Amino acid sequence: MKQRNVNRVALIGAGSVGSSYAFALLNQSITEELVIIDLNENKAMGDAMDLNHGKVFAPNPTKTWYGTYSDCKDADIVCICAGANQKPGETRLDLVEKNLRIFKGIVEEIMASGFDGIFLIATNPVDILTYATWKFSGLPKERIIGSGTILDTGRFRFLLGEYFDIAPANVHAYIIGEHGDTELPVWSHADIGGISITELIKRNPEYTMKDLDELFINVRDAAYQIIEKKGATFYGIAMGLARITKAILNNENSVLTVSTYLDGEYGTEDVYMGVPAVVNRNGIREIVELTLNEQERQQFKHSANVLKEILAPNFKEQ
């Protein structure tokens, strides 16, 4: 990997997610340089101008400009938010063919620049497109990261916090699997202050597993609800992307639920899925393999199989 004294993030795609991500980066002063690249040059230029005008209010100034793929050469992270959007009633997997075509061209342009950093993928279906980026780029698998279930996990912790009247930061619970309809909650490892969720239910009759099952459905279907109401989701995922970016650039070794390549972990292989992983300056340091109960293992296996069925016709063995 290329080592520079100045951190640079290249953003591909200045749509709602990309622009919100850029806004989050500047507000938290996560990177020293941000270059915005979009087919619509005027949109990228406008975003760069708008963000620069607010730099005086940020903790530290971030050099921000609109650029071209050649600017990816010196980037530490390229975050791809470009692609076709999910429409009302459309699943994330419905976007596969459209976005695979788009991604092949984007990744080839980025690699032609001499880029040798870390890819961060946000475009849906994120697990499929993260795998595609790995295949198209030829970079090591640990340097290709998808947003995975980081937002689902955030939604999960928020709703659990509301239910138990506890700050979400003190709720420890994960959503794993596909970022989509087959994702699953890991109830067997969910706790608040070291007390398991199942134990809390036993102690207090006002809490029920039926309520929590409904809570998970609200987590899983949150995107559909938001899309129906406002057309797209972008603030939450942008903040999740900013969190991953911070973990990488600061070499945090933080555990985040991101889409990463499985090579035997969780009983599956040759697929990118959302699982807890240690994230640092080199990308994915290691996967945190939770001990799942039998029901969770079966659900995870089903989620993996759904993704593999989508991948199979598009990435045949060479």
UniProtKB/Swiss-Prot annotation:
Catalytic activity: (S)-lactate + NAD(+) = pyruvate + NADH + H(+)
Pathway(s) per entry: Fermentation; pyruvate fermentation to lactate; (S)-lactate from pyruvate: step 1/1
Chain positions with Phosphotyrosine modification: 224
Matches recorded under InterPro entries: L-lactate/malate_DH, L-lactate_DH, L-lactate_DH_AS, Lactate/malate_DH_C, Lactate/malate_DH_N, Lactate_DH/Glyco_Ohase_4_C, NAD(P)-bd_dom_sf
GO-annotated cellular components: cytoplasm
Alphabetical list of NCBIfam families matching this protein: L-LDH-NAD, PRK00066.1, PRK06223.1
Name of the molecule in the record: L-lactate dehydrogenase 1
The species this protein was found in: Peribacillus psychrosaccharolyticus
